[in-house]
């Protein structure tokens, strides 16, 4: 027989399942949505701590046994920080630099904000914090080209964002589909000051005599994939 050691934290897994059930109940009453997913990891070593892809695995009618954690979905505003990171890394701008949140025609597209209002001149930091759409699109253009942004987010782990897909500027507000587990890994890069860790669920595997057959080893002295300053 084999003994498999996983990275899953039983307490966090239980709490994650409870949270998903509660949130699904809210989503169902407000939006008619019957499912949700949650995935978490240790930013420092990439170990998967909890993973839930629905309130009830056996609820086949509502896709309970479909793993939504690896399903492609539009990330919406959660994609914006990556656009900002590239813009800041390629331009002489920072968190306190001004950016205009006002009605702007980007050629064939004039986007709006969620609340249908405009805040005028604000800092880059606040534009991201308040999730304003127009500044995010401006950051997209400061990131040089769509290919540059695709290359960056793929380096963060979002492998479902592909080249030559024609996302265009709407990509800045999250139209390119990603997998929740990849988005989680990408966000961990921010928390880990630019260091990307591989997501894994198995720590080690031993045989019946206690011999280690396989063991995950973290890569030491790994170079950051982007500047911590960004």
Regions found by a protein language model. Name each.
Residues 6-29, 38-42, 51-52, 59-69, ...:
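A penicillin-recognizing enzyme superfamily signal
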Residues 1-4, 62-70, 133, 163-171, ...:
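Glycine- and acidic
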Residues 3-4, 26-38, 96, 160-171, ...:
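Surface-exposed patches in mature extracellular/periplasmic domains of secreted proteins
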Residues 44, 93-149, 196, 208-230:
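Conserved catalytic neighborhood of penicillin-recognizing serine enzymes
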Residues 33-38, 45-49, 113, 123-125, ...:
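Short glycine-rich loop/turn motifs
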Residues 110-113, 143-185:
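Mid-domain, small-residue-enriched loop/turn segments at the edges of structured enzyme/sensor domains
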Residues 15-23, 90, 130, 139-142, ...:
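Generic, well-ordered alpha-helical scaffold segments in large soluble proteins
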Residues 16, 45-46, 66-99, 127, ...:
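Active-site SXXK
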